[in-house]
Amino acid sequence: MTRNPFMVEPSNGSPNRRGASNLSKFYANANSNSRWANPSEESLEDSYDQSNVFQGLPASPSRAALRYSPDRRHRTQFYRDSAHNSPVAPNRYAANLQESPKRAGEAVIHLSEGSNLYPRDNADLPVDPYHLSPQQQPSNNLFGSGRLYSQSSKYTMSTTSTTAPSLAEADDEKEKYLTSTTSYDDQSTIFSADTFNETKFELNHPTRQQYVRRANSESKRRMVSDLPPPSKKKALLKLDNPIPKGLLDTLPRRNSPEFTEMRYTACTVEPDDFLREGYTLRFAEMNRECQIAICITMYNEDKYSLARTIHSIMKNVAHLCKREKSHVWGPNGWKKVSVILISDGRAKVNQGSLDYLAALGVYQEDMAKASVNGDPVKAHIFELTTQVSINADLDYVSKDIVPVQLVFCLKEENKKKINSHRWLFNAFCPVLQPTVVTLVDVGTRLNNTAIYRLWKVFDMDSNVAGAAGQIKTMKGKWGLKLFNPLVASQNFEYKISNILDKPLESVFGYISVLPGALSAYRYRALKNHEDGTGPLRSYFLGETQEGRDHDVFTANMYLAEDRILCWELVAKRDAKWVLKYVKEATGETDVPEDVSEFISQRRRWLNGAMFAAIYAQLHFYQIWKTKHSVVRKFFLHVEFLYQFIQMLFSWFSIANFVLTFYYLAGSMNLVIKHGEALFIFFKYLIFCDLASLFIISMGNRPQGAKHLFITSMVILSICATYSLICGFVFAFKSLASGTESHKIFVDIVISLLSTYGLYFFSSLMYLDPWHMFTSSIQYFLTLPAFTCTLQIFAFCNTHDVSWGTKGSTQESKQLSKAIVVQGPDGKQIVETDWPQEVDKKFLEIKSRLKEPEFEESSGNEKQSKNDYYRDIRTRIVMIWMLSNLILIMSIIQVFTPQDTDNGYLIFILWSVAALAAFRVVGSMAFLFMKYLRIIVSYRNKVEGSGSWEVSKLDLPNVFHKKG
């Protein structure tokens, strides 16, 4: 067992000097019925004759004894009160050796050195989360609760190498503990000078016992029996430091170190070796069941976005604790949820976000170390169970907030979001073993029941491997952001996707992408096969895509690695996993309000989606190796066919747009005066604009050519609006004239109106039609511009496989180092800087938290010069551009602008209407199945209660807007 140099050794625990002859004659709580004599009896009076003679002041207490004493007495006061014949002298024999109130017998249990750092936590006990558990209440003894928050410049700690106990050993210790109250034989009751005082001290003083255990866990080497041993042993540095006193005074619960002390772990290994090297998390050491692990990935988002997300998650955890009738949740539900925040790079993280975390108590900057024994730290892990929250207005909130187990992993290097997920799935999840893993992006605000709704899908259907939440756009106060056409068009796009696309794919069982802003996975489904293949292996292949070792196709495909993960789950060998859409779980996210950021974001989305769709189409045969039913496999093939058609339309989207403009605008040549002149002007204008877009996209970044992109998009919108007006004017004149030659254009207008009508009908059926009134006009006017601009820029930048679209912050602060050296007594000593003035820094952070942030303009990032990627990019653009150009020239040669019998245009427009109708059918099927489940659930509740008056249904309220 690792020893704390500040702790009094068992041989020094007695008030007598070391080496006293009567050391082994102290007995605990002896009574007249015990076979062990009481020291106060006359038969032993001679043995304690030394107590009648003054032999000097008692042994000096350790720093830990002073720190954990109930009244925190000074050393001189301790001497005075402990002197012989002092009127306030405590009975030190009884105080040091008194028995724990939770043990009824007088047996002594020898605690093994491999005991857990914390007592086992029984999450199933119906204990009020706002009150203390009887087992957690500190006993009123000499070393009671309370801690003196003093700091020192150096922290020295003794360590030894220990081996983690196996599960069998842990069960043996538990059995000994449970049977000790009735067993009094000599084998289970050990009385010796070497073990008696130590055993009784650790057992009978819970507060000091916890301190010893925490000290033992601070730096040790541990082997995991079921994993292969590491090639090189490394010292594991774990430091527990009190949270600031200003925060501690506001906490309703202070009965456990998880509330009062922040733990820091300096991880010097890669995430794949986290468990094998002996690293763990404090919540796992407490033996708690983990139902949900919520992962928040962060790059350089500001404190307002972080506060919005974390506060909404805390309200979700509080909702879980309110579900008292649930078979899983209830008052202690917070113990089954772990919130893991992973920041991608210490140099990239926003300082305001760090201040926010420090205000919660989970982050202390001075605790982080640069290296341990010369090994560079890969990740800084901070752990705390926080009981307060800070909302988006940066105000403290404690009402209706339950404790939340929070882990903050600050990666030393910036290795992209996929590496953050590697830390989650390969490092933390094997330790916590969660049932469901929920992924949330910083900036997403969840409704109060989102986490529960996502978890409930997995609980009700054992075949569900993943679930997608409903993503909404933040429209600002009173919806003022909708005046920005960019925000309004994205709002309409998100709504149509939530009403048509996601429900359709959910009915088939395969959702092409689970949004990273709000999605959930079953951890068991993510695990690889025994041969190493599986979803996670395919998912993390994208982290090492560099240079000629991997082709551009693979590199771009892994820009949408979440799409690959969705496919691998559904097509997992010898399984029958499906993906579902959860309409009730909503998350509001901020969308790009600037054109440059919007183009950069969609470039990654479009390239990743196209190459991932090609990957799924080429590997559709993997479905045959699954255990899906024949009916499921048939409908999955129907979905593959639908996606293939959608992919073809996407590939030829530029050509279809140009041809639609060409014939709609050309229809006015013979209708109005100077119609042909207008047609020629707009025709050459759109051709020149498209050619300019290719040049701009090939040689400029959106941040550097923002105005050029905006100008091109405005021109495309004007041309599209002109062609649409021409089509409607020509259709109305055709209706007025009643000529047979113009019926074909009437069909064109009807096909267009039917497409928009289907959108409106579906929105009404989902009781969410407001976007049709507030955002549809902006969407339809900007759709051609977005289609052309985004497609051209995406294809012209297939060589760019980078992720980041945001600037970085300033240089990171230099960290101190931790050195483990060999002491003269054979023990290992860890020397490192200890944080100074924790309380003062906390006050500074609180005052700085409310200050507004001013973002500094970041310089242009260094662009990749990989000739191989650029060569492949050129070939892809040439093939795509020439294929669209050949289609345009072929159709133009067949049909003239004045030709009313244009079969190709009719085919395109009715195809769009047919695809929209197919999506509507799938959406209505999803809605029908949803209401059918509600009816069946209601019927089951009625049959269970025997009455039609069911007081409270655990059903989603579909007629009210979710919060």
From Swiss-Prot:
Q: What is the effect of changing residue 441 to E?
A: Loss of activity
The impact of changing residue 514 to A is: 80% decrease of activity
Q: Where is the composition biased (Polar residues)?
A: 11-41, 133-143
Give any Gene Ontology cellular component. Answer: cell septum
UniProt biased composition (Basic and acidic residues): 215-224
Q: What is this protein called?
A: Chitin synthase 2
**Consequence of mutating residue 508 to A?**
60% decrease of activity
Changing residue 563 to A has the effect of: Loss of activity
**Annotated source species:** Saccharomyces cerevisiae (strain ATCC 204508 / S288c) (Baker's yeast)
The record's section on InterPro entries has:
Chitin_synth, Chitin_synth_fun, Chitin_synth_N, Nucleotide-diphossugar_trans
Record: glycosylation sites: 22, 197, 447
